[in-house]
């Protein structure tokens, strides 16, 4: 059997090792850039999804917004 492999050693080369992905840790991750908060999504909202039709802004208005004069601390 070793003679057989010896004859075809030119065709059966050693396979290159797959490149390992570089591990990412917290120090490599920065603050979000150009982040715009649009809405809060609760667990009940996951099953309903977005209504078909209408613009994205109209769909987000149905989620509610921030009322002027009420801080998040008061909520």
Curated annotation (Swiss-Prot):
Family: Belongs to the CDC42SE/SPEC family.
Cystine connections: none
Subcellular location: Cytoplasm, Cytoskeleton; Cell membrane
Organism expressing this protein natively: Xenopus laevis (African clawed frog)
Residues with a covalently attached lipid (S-palmitoyl cysteine): 10-11
A biological-process GO annotation: regulation of signal transduction
Protein name: CDC42 small effector protein 2-C
CRIB domain sequence ranges: 29-42
Gene this chain is encoded by: cdc42se2-c
Job description of the protein: Probably involved in the organization of the actin cytoskeleton by acting downstream of CDC42, inducing actin filament assembly.
Gene Ontology molecular function: small GTPase binding
Cellular compartments per GO CC: cytoplasm; cytoskeleton; plasma membrane
Keywords: Cell membrane, Cell shape, Cytoplasm, Cytoskeleton, Lipoprotein, Membrane, Palmitate
Membrane disposition: Lipid-anchor
């Amino acid at each position: 059997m070793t003679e057989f492999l010896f004859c075809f050693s030119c065709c059966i080369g050693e396979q290159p090792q797959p490149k390992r992905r570089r591990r990412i840790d917290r120090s490599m991750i920065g603050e979000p850039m150009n982040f715009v908060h649009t809405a809060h999504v609760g667990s009940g909202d996951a099953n309903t999804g977005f209504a078909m039709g209408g613009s994205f802004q109209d769909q987000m208005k149905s989620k509610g917004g921030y009322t002027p004069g009420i801080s998040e601390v008061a909520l």
